[in-house]
């Protein structure tokens, strides 16, 4: 006890505890799954309430920012792995990328802490103000520039678990508000009757979260349709991919797996991941090329092939590039183009360079070895790949964004192709799978997910991986499955983030009532004794 008191007296104890609180909250996310880490949010709320009284704004901001550094540092450290693919050239950038990303994303938490402080809540119900401030800034994190909603607090719950099912009602942002309100409540439980009431409501809400989820998981989905799919994962490591001498070997790996004998009839759809082959789709699918013929030979007549890859339009030294999903059908002797989906949400500094002209002038583009930018595709829309089958493609990190694709009741499944090979055997790929699976819950539609090195999977409309329908990191093989059934149209599909906005409004009303109550108390005339 004495040691703890001495520690608390240190000027650096608050910042250190804030960093630890952020780390704890990050540990609650998959693949770690240490759910008691959610108490990190209660710790952060306590630290914000007990900021330095002499410099409160500065103290609050830095505590929020440091908690964010811990949260995003542990949550996105895997981004450094991408710079180690070509370590001799880019390895020196890895520590700067990891720390820079964590520090930049943590600014949203610093601003959220300032917003919480500005509202100056005093009652125990300030936990709702805390939830509203941080949930609002998390929404901003998902929308500023192109947005990066990686590991929203509401997506702490493993997709497919009971608590995750509430995303079908309120979406990932609404679930973020609810998660923060529940997790922050222990910070106020000692504050008299109001604190006990707030904590009791949080406990009841947690029970309700699990109860609603259990009911949702027990509801039957529509029967699986007759459409079958084969997902191909060739386990081509990123550092080998751009070796020109290995190109034929990579093609052979994909076509061999595609042609693997079926237990019954050939699948209706074959899916290759994003960037499956290290060349432009225009080039390797050009008429007469050996690659085109190899693909034709690997398919049965009538089969559909969905290939993730880059393509270009126009001639000359600077054509227009797109990151695309190309749908092809095998005819009797050749391939015919069925449709193309172009990625809409591009990765900053990975697929395009913000302020391109300026950064090119100062030499950053050359330093980072970025070639011509990809071009943004149109607003995401479903792709009809057969007369009876409409799918919604999501390329790579498009699967992070709640509500990115407009709901369409005729869509049968979501197709997520991604190249997670950049991130090796780290926490990045399993986290990406978890986040993508939330789109299944929100839309009540299954996801067919293909990656080069894992994790490929068939995910049902409740966010659960279909038993036996996944390939882990470093595995090579195919997934053969029927497309799972759908659920009923969800409130989130119908109304989007309306529920989230209502929750933010509740936070605002609580804060306003507390402040009005304070003002009224301060100006009310004091009763004189007669």
From Swiss-Prot:
Q: What is this protein called?
A: Apolipoprotein N-acyltransferase
Which segments constitute the CN hydrolase domain? Answer: 232-485
- State the similarity comment: Belongs to the CN hydrolase family. Apolipoprotein N-acyltransferase subfamily.
Q: Which CDD domains match?
A: ALP_N-acyl_transferase
**Where does the record place it?**
Cell inner membrane
Metabolic or biological pathway: Protein modification; lipoprotein biosynthesis (N-acyl transfer)
Top-tier EC class? transferase
Annotated coiled-coil positions are none
What membrane topology does the UniProt entry give?
Multi-pass membrane protein
What gene is this protein translated from? lnt
Reply yes or no: does the keyword Coiled coil apply. Answer: no
